[in-house]
Amino acid sequence: MSLYFEEFVLDRLLETRGRTITESDVVSFAGLSGDFIELHTNDEYAKTTPFGQRIAHGALIFSVSIGLMTQMNLVTETVLAFYGVDKMRFTKPVFIGDTVRVAKRVIETREMGHSRGLITFDSKVLNQHGETVLAYQDKLLVKRRPSET
C-alpha cells in the first residue's frame, strides 16, 4: 500500500534490503550506457589503479538505489514525479561482489497546493560493511491524502 505525503514525517527512516552487485550488472550497464571506461571493463587496467580491481559505475549504484526503494512499494500509487537530486557524492568504490542497501531519512516536507507535497530525503547507499558508498539528497513529489467529503 502506497504512502501519502502526510505519512512522511520528519526523521522517518526507510531502509531497503540488500542487493549484490554482479559482473553481469557492470557489463550490462556498460552496454546500456555506453560507458566502457576501462576502470569498469578492463581487469588488467584496473589492477594498475589505486582500487586494484574493477569498480562498478557510480551511475549504476545510483540506479540500483532507486530500484531498491521502488521495490518497497512505498509510493508506487502516490508518486507524481522524481523531482531531483542534490549533493550527490560517491564516497567509496563499489566492487563486483559487494552488497549494497539504502537508508533514507525524511529531512524536509513541503506542501505544494491541495493535492501534492514535496518530500526531501537524505539518502545513503551502504555496503556490506555499513560504509557509505554514495550519499545524496533526493526529492519526490507525492500525492496528498484525498480529503473526505
Regions found by a protein language model. Give the residues of each.
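Catalytic strand-loop segment that frames the active site of acyl-thioester-processing enzymes
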Residues: 1-56, 143-144
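HotDog/MaoC-like acyl-thioester-processing domains
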Residues: 1-9, 90, 94-149
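Phosphate-binding glycine-rich loops and adjacent basic patches that engage nucleotide phosphates
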Residues: 21-32, 61-67, 87-88
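Short, intrinsically disordered, mixed-charge
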Residues: 31-35, 67-74, 128
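Hydrophobic beta-strand-centered segment that forms part of the acyl-chain substrate-binding groove
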Residues: 47-56, 62-107
